[in-house]
Amino acid sequence: MPTVFPHDSVGLVTPQTAHFSEPLALACGRSLPAYDLIYETYGQLNAARSNAVLICHALSGHHHAAGFHSADDRKPGWWDSCIGPGKPIDTNTFFVVSLNNLGGCNGSTGPSSIDPDTGKPLGANFPVVTVEDWVNSQARLADLLGIDTWAAVIGGSLGGMQALQWTISYPDRVRHCLAIASAPKLSAQNIAFNEVARQAILTDPEFHGGSFQERGVIPKRGLMLARMVGHITYLSDDSMGEKFGRGLKSEKLNYDFHSVEFQVESYLRYQGEEFSGRFDANTYLLMTKALDYFDPAANFNDDLAKTFANATAKFCVMSFTTDWRFSPARSRELVDALMAARKDVCYLEIDAPQGHDAFLIPIPRYLQAFGNYMNRISL
């Protein structure tokens, strides 16, 4: 990693931690007596405090969305292609806030946090949290930072669900909502994929009912399988065919059940191995449940248009043609509801072969459209 950062990078960033001592009531009926949220900021908050943008992360995301933590970092933050000087979320214009949600495993209070009463990791004792809970905690962070209204709340996938929830829970605090590769709720198929992933973790002998940290182990096999299943759904058939096809790792087949023979097998095992070394199993369970439970229209007799009746934000919805996890049809469903509710909404369906993960990839047309929308936001 060079010590001189690219001209369009936010450069070195230092995470900050906000502590909240006021209890947070949760949708599950429990509450968190106190909690921490770790976050990063990029750019400068203007005098009018009108240029703040909130970034909401997806399932395995975190607060480190842009820049570098040290000169030795091999890779920048997970959305560095979109955040920085001259990029779609231009830090010469906007003050950007990115946090790790409650239940995460990157510094915010979650299952791997130590219970002050027992001195042990909270593990499975950490309560189930929802998208609505996250938005409520994010609103407290906004209060702490002195931000009354977000110029924009932006997210992809699960992050897009949070952006949508902001316009429902705090309609007067969001001026623009950008929901990318997202959906108004999960389909039965999506819930099914999440359940397969959860069962892989829950049935791993090293899971120990969620208390694996106390035993100094991790449910590695379960996490690997969960990630492998999930990763397949993030890619399109075309992109997998182009990248791997039926390519072999070696020149011939071994005719057994244990060898890694196809290149796609090797790739999935690598992804699972890498993920199991950096992500908490209890957090994975929580994140998938938050996805499953997101269904804001359920509180409005399943009328999605009524769900957004009080929203004052302008909406930008983007989807990708080969995304079959959150297909363009789901985005169009959202757009139709917003139009029925007479909201200001624009929609872009981007032709991209990469599948669901396309929202993380610097596709020129995507970045251009993203930037064009952000440039129209008045401060």
Swiss-Prot record:
The active site is at S157 (nucleophile), D323, H356. Pfam families: Abhydrolase_1 (PF00561). It is an enzyme of class 2 (transferase). Coiled coil: none annotated. It catalyses: L-homoserine + succinyl-CoA = O-succinyl-L-homoserine + CoA. One of its GO terms (molecular function) is homoserine O-succinyltransferase activity. One of its GO terms (biological process) is methionine biosynthetic process. Keywords: Acyltransferase, Amino-acid biosynthesis, Cytoplasm, Methionine biosynthesis, Transferase. The record marks R325 as: Important for acyl-CoA specificity. Residues 51-360 form the AB hydrolase-1 domain. Substrate binds at R227, D357. One of its GO terms (cellular component) is cytoplasm. Pathway: Amino-acid biosynthesis; L-methionine biosynthesis via de novo pathway; O-succinyl-L-homoserine from L-homoserine: step 1/1. It is found in: Cytoplasm. Homodimer. Belongs to the AB hydrolase superfamily. MetX family. Transfers a succinyl group from succinyl-CoA to L-homoserine, forming succinyl-L-homoserine. PANTHER family: HOMOSERINE O-ACETYLTRANSFERASE (PTHR32268:SF11). This is Homoserine O-succinyltransferase. It comes from Pseudomonas savastanoi pv. phaseolicola (strain 1448A / Race 6).
